Amino acid sequence: MLLQAQRLEQQGKLPEAERLYQQAIQLAGSSPLAAEAQLRLAALYMRKMERYDDALKIYEQLIKQYRTGEIAAEATLRMGELYERQMQKTADQKERNALEQKALEAYRRLENDFRDTAVAKGEGKQRLEALLRRIDERNRNHPAYLFWDVLVALTGRQPWLSYWVAIVLFTLIVLALLTPLRVAWFRSFREMKKLEPEVRRLRERYKGQELNEKIMELYKQHKVNPAAGCLPMLIQMPILIYVFYAIRLYEYQFSKGFFLWINPSLAERFPGIVGANLGQHDLPLLVLYAISLYITQRLTPVSDPAQAEQMKMMSLFMTVFMLYMMYLWRFPSAFVLYWFVSNILMTAQQLRYMKVEPEPAAPLATTTNPPEPAPAAASSNPGKNHHTRKPRRKR
């Protein structure tokens, strides 16, 4: 029946071929023959009938049903091909970019989750390489791409040296740009730290709204803005997002670079754990990043001692969350290396600033009461009666 459907497809009788494929799927039940018929039907929808949504549903169903093995790998590969075909059919640049990213994700998933299949080693690898080259060609004139290229060229484009050194240099440059913001944050923290003893005294004397008013009065007296420490952190976010974008622009070139254990030799011995290059995911580097993140979070100073335990739990939560998300999304090791180096440098910077002990602040100025009268001076001879006798009146 499949051969007959193929002949009808070659003759251009697409509706008849579609019906035969559907009949073959029903007759085959849950056997591998049904999966083959589904793949052929989805290919018919995608390549000749342009029914992309119908084809996508079949591919998603096959991936969910088979999970691993050649059938799921084939469905993943064809899903990437489908997105590329859709990309060629649209003129909207925003939509093209979104479809291109979906195709890249499908090929990346094929490379990571189905690396031992013939599909991943053959056509999947070729399609991923071709797509990355096209993206790289398009990005070559972007300022961030050119900047990366200059950093790599400084050390001669050596695979074992140039690319990770470029990441370290890039991290130093970004940290230098962020240093004024971080210094402002530490200054704000120091001012808050100086006021801690006085804030504790206010907490002992006042409650509720009156306490808040007294604390704000104290901050105003010492010209401290409690929200000033948050502003530098908020300003950093757009910069960090751009850093991620800049690394993604140069992702294809990073696949030519290695770092210590991240190389093809060890990747073959430990597949799925060690990355073959800086463009691939690497688990040991991700674990090192998570450890550095936890240490950085724990060393972040807290102005209020009552928040110390809460900060400890938040540090642990953030570490586990970031570890899970970066593992799930299979971030390229070039990006993880940037974060790892950045955490080390920021931790060193924090330790340097934390060595300086803040001086205690002056107490809150209050209205002074008039001094109480001094007690009467005691007699110099405590053994005698303090009350003097009146002299007797003469009669």
Regions found by a protein language model. Give the residues of each.
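Alpha-helical segment of the N-proximal tetratricopeptide repeat
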Residues: 1-23, 27-28, 43-48
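Helix-loop-helix
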Residues: 10, 47-48, 57, 61-65, ...
